[in-house]
């Protein structure tokens, strides 16, 4: 909402197809996974795919349990995925390289699985975003590495899901999925840095983060961005 998007969280089978068909982007987040929701996600995914809507999956906790790993893999196999965003362990689990997840936290550093992320992007013809101390965005051919953000972001619940929602908002208005993913990831990191400078503690820093999402000021962002290509 702060960014200007208008999200709606729907799980009922009776409405997900209609909503997904008309949404700017469908975000499938398995954070609060339950078996009945899997059918709703499948219906929403089919509708979004049929209507050529971008689809994002956040495989929260993939690698922590078989249910989460298999659910995320099933969503990928259904097809039509535009982007996958997760931490290093979640992406490694989807790539089948044995990543383990501690709750929603990664046990791997993001720069250790760049090859797995690239392979996953090629396999499903999508964009893969690996979040961490360094963020990586790859389309399977080119990879952009960004070094923005702040350590406080890993200490507040929901920041990963926020990054995924932000990605969905950017994809809804930019048909170039690779560019949209890079811009969303950069903006998330830069907003986190600015919030750290403005906040006094974790609570006020999160409020400051929402402030910059709602009213990004030019002075809040550095003139030189820290990124590289591979």
Describe these PLM feature segments.
Residues 116-121, 177-192, 209-210:
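Short, well-structured alpha-helical segments that form the helix of a local strand-helix-strand
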Residues 37-86:
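Glycine/small-residue-rich loop that forms an oxyanion/phosphate-binding "nest" at active or ligand-binding sites
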Residues 118, 144-157:
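Short pre-catalytic strand/loop immediately N-terminal to key active-site residues, enriched for Gly-Thr
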Residues 2-52, 57:
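Active-site cofactor/substrate anionic-group-binding motifs, chiefly glycine-
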Residues 33-36, 61-65, 136, 153:
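Short, small-residue-enriched loops and turns at beta-alpha junctions
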Residues 67-143:
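Conserved phosphate/ATP/ADP-binding segment of small-molecule kinases
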């Amino acid at each position: 909402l702060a960014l200007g998007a208008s999200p709606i969280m729907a799980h009922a089978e009776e409405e997900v197809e209609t909503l997904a068909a008309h949404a700017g982007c469908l975000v499938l987040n398995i954070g609060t996974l339950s078996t009945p929701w899997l059918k709703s996600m499948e219906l929403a995914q089919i509708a979004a795919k049929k209507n050529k809507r971008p689809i994002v999956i956040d495989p929260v906790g993939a690698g922590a349990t078989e249910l989460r790993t298999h659910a995320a893999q099933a969503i990928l196999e259904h097809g039509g995925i535009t982007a996958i965003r997760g931490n290093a362990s979640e992406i490694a689990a989807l790539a089948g390289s044995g990543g383990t997840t501690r709750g929603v936290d990664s046990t791997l550093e993001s720069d250790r699985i760049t090859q797995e992320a690239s392979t996953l992007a090629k396999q499903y013809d999508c964009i893969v975003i690996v979040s961490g101390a360094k963020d990586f965005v790859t389309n399977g051919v080119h990879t952009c590495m960004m070094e923005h953000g702040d350590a406080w972001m890993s200490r507040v619940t929901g920041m990963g899901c926020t990054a995924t929602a932000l990605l969905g908002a950017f994809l809804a208005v930019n048909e170039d999925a690779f560019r949209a993913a890079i811009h969303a990831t950069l903006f998330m990191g830069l907003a986190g840095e600015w919030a750290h400078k403005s906040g006094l503690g974790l609570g006020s820093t999160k409020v400051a983060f929402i402030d910059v999402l709602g009213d990004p000021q030019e002075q809040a962002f550095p003139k030189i961005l820290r990124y590289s290509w591979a």
